[in-house]
Amino acid sequence: MRLDMPCVETAHLLLRPVEEGDVCDMFTYYSDPLVMRYLSLHPHTDIEETLNSIRSYFLTWEKRGVPQAWVIVHKHDDKVIGNLDIHTIDGDIGEIGYLMHPDYWNQGLMREAVSALVKAGFAHVGLRRMEAYVAVEHPASAAVLKHCGFVQEGILRKLALLSDGRYHDMVLMSILKEYILTESFRLDK
């Protein structure tokens, strides 16, 4: 299993490992309550909090035994607009997570990024299965995953304590490596 992640270029995005120099752009979305509402993290209140997250979480991937996280760079304006990662590995199963600045929502950019992560997770990292948990109240995120080939497996009741301080039902979605080998599957659709 390879944990170093290559840089990947898509039609509109550059996906590359997180660096400390990304802190200003990352703070703009980590401090936004809209972005953080379906996550277990609270909005960041100052840039130091974001820098500490980069240092203690994103740059410790090797020690934690997970692949490097990517920032999502929008090629049109060369801004870091989000990040995504395979944040948990259990054998050959990886759990993914992602978030994006709201100015870039509803443009198909997260689908583009998640599709690239799925390809890298199976081809580069060597995973057999990838999973994501999505708050029931967040159908847009589930739609991103469905577009990328994930299927809903079920709903886990009151699974996650989110930033609002309440437990939420979460949809478990997954994709299998064998599925992407079928002719009916295309990540670039």
Q: Model-predicted segments: where are they?
A:
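Acyl-donor (CoA/ACP) binding surface of acyl/acetyltransferases
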Residues: M1-D25, Y29-M36, V71-K189
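Hydrophobic residues in alpha-helical segments
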Residues: Y30, L39, W61-E62
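Conserved GNAT-fold acetyl-CoA-binding loop/helix
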Residues: L34-S56, Q68
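Juxtamembrane helix-loop transition sites at the ends of transmembrane segments
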Residues: E49, R55-F58, M170, I175
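A short helix-loop-beta-strand connector motif used in the catalytic cores of GNAT acetyltransferases and
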Residues: Y57-V71
